[in-house]
Amino acid sequence: MLGLFKKKVTVVTHNGSFHADDVFACATLSLWAEKENINLKIVRSRDDNIIKKADMVVDVGDIYDPEKGRFDHHQRGGAGEHDNGIQYASFGLVWKKYGEQICDQEIAKTIENKLVLPIDAIDNGVNVSKNLREDVKEYSVAREMIYPLRFSPDGKGFEHFIEIAKIILKSEINMLRQITDQQKRVEKEIESQLEPEILILNEDIYWDKVVTSHRKIKAAIYPEPDASWWCAEVARDDLTDYNSNRASFPESWRGLRDEALVNISGVPEAVFCHRAGFFAVAKTKEAALEMARCALQN
């Protein structure tokens, strides 16, 4: 019965082919509506009469006026820019108003930088990356996944990708909430262990980003989620650069496992060492700690 009394909001976006910005803009509004217990209806049309009657208009209509629910960026002069100069597309305009209503300010800003900015940039014809190798191309969800269905005559492709976009947004929000909570716990561990060279964690949580600002820490050990194995991993100055490792496991260990690794390392419970030398696995906490110490001495 409660559903009968939901506030109803109609959103109009353009029909025809679609792109990531209008898909994610509508997905954002759908998540906002779910949180606010609003009955949201999405209509795809370029008819001026339908657009005028809509409660919200996204990526069509040539008007940007968030107070009136208008979120287009195609008009002369555009609809403004992000702080870094990238022009807003419809996703960015909608996220600017509703992102913090779906999640908190810090998470909304992170999602803007991670997801909104590249989609807005692509929609405005701005390249944000280049291939470092000619024989390997980057796979973009924003482009490759949407393209095959964006011309679907029955419009089902658009509905399908709104659901995918909602899953992506929910996943990002939930992940960032977990990371924020876990990083606070890591900071407490670092403080309680007096910023050690080897950080000992009793759970598998997001530690690596926190450790980048604690230069004394060279490695961490932590259990697998099911506690069947213990992992030893070196810390990095830059999480995007494996050349910034603060330590490394011995060259002679790399790529070995089980008996071969036990024989060369002298650690009876050693299980595996990654061939790049930044990660190793042991059967026990004590063995993982011993392997981490070897990495620091290497």
Predicted regions and their residues:
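Glycine-rich, Lys/Arg-enriched anion-binding loops that position phosphate/diphosphate groups
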Residues: 126-235
